[in-house]
């Protein structure tokens, strides 16, 4: 198996040939949603894809797949036992102007998280700075209300002496502008290109240096670029020759 390679062709034919069993730490992919008339935007047979994903992913590896409705529902329903939850990418700029008279403009896109057979996944949360009003001083005692509808333990509890009042665990909202920098109209390399910062955030959240990432519909190669920047290995695949060549050039530069 060769790593840090980009393959041209149908991923359902390439994965069995080039990816070994239980070799991948993270599958990170922007699958075709089937919502446009573009030649490349045809939904891959999900039953065949899941068979390969479950073969190559490690037992505690993560499968991250971009989606938006109605494809999100189709995707989750195709393997509900492996589905964990969704992150929500806030693109800042709205879309869907053609149907603005009939429904709200769309600003969110889903990042669906799956595991192998529902297993626990490796998770390395990128901590966030807490707002001043939400900070709790170290080593201070707090009182929980007795009426606790969420089933949490009531009574007194004490913050840890090692508690860092400046940091909080991440929320599931990911705010990354989809029309600035490399994604503006002049620089964009692919119609559904994702922000490199977003890709790198998710890579940091679920992998460590030296881990292997698979992107079987890589488009312009942003996943591979993020992996390279963060000292991870990658295997990428792309069926469209034009975008395959773009991805190869980005990774060579």
Predicted feature residues:
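Core catalytic lobe of class I
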Residues: 1-236, 242-246
